[in-house]
Amino acid sequence: KSLSIGPSVFLNLVDDILMWLKFSSGIKGSFWMSKSALGNRNGLQISLYGDKGSANWIQTEPEILKLFSNDGTCTILDRGGRTKVCGSPRYNRYKAGHPAGFLEAFANLYSDIADAFIQFDEAGAHQNPYVFGFDHSVKGLNLFAAACKSNEYGSWEELKPVVF
């Protein structure tokens, strides 16, 4: 079973999902999405685990990325540091420690969309990796449809390739 749907206080509304994934590469993953987990305050958290280390980012501490190596070392990267991405002007409209994030994320997205429109107008296609199109949206819906089917039958469900 690759999906667990929890109870809701509202009829016919899914507001708590735990999804397990197995990729063809052998990597395993999980998603927990909930609108009913009291106290989390839309607490987006992304964690990646591997055999050489792990990384953790938490929405409530948006300026910090924690890296953990298999020798026990913990490295903390912050927005004010001299890292390749964190130090980019795109992510530093304000100095480290000043509130930033939500509005800036949308500003970056709108800027990326505008650039993609210009590229598309000039070349008939765009190369911006941050602007998704119809095919990406359909693949995401396909994932959730397979998860619902998995929940219904109580077994793993293979994602079918999406052909455009």
PLM region descriptions:
Residues K1-S25, S47, K52-V131, D135:
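C-terminal glycine/acidic-rich active-site capping loop/insertion
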Residues W32-S36, Y49-K52, F132, K160:
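Glycine-rich Rossmann NAD(P)(H)-binding loop
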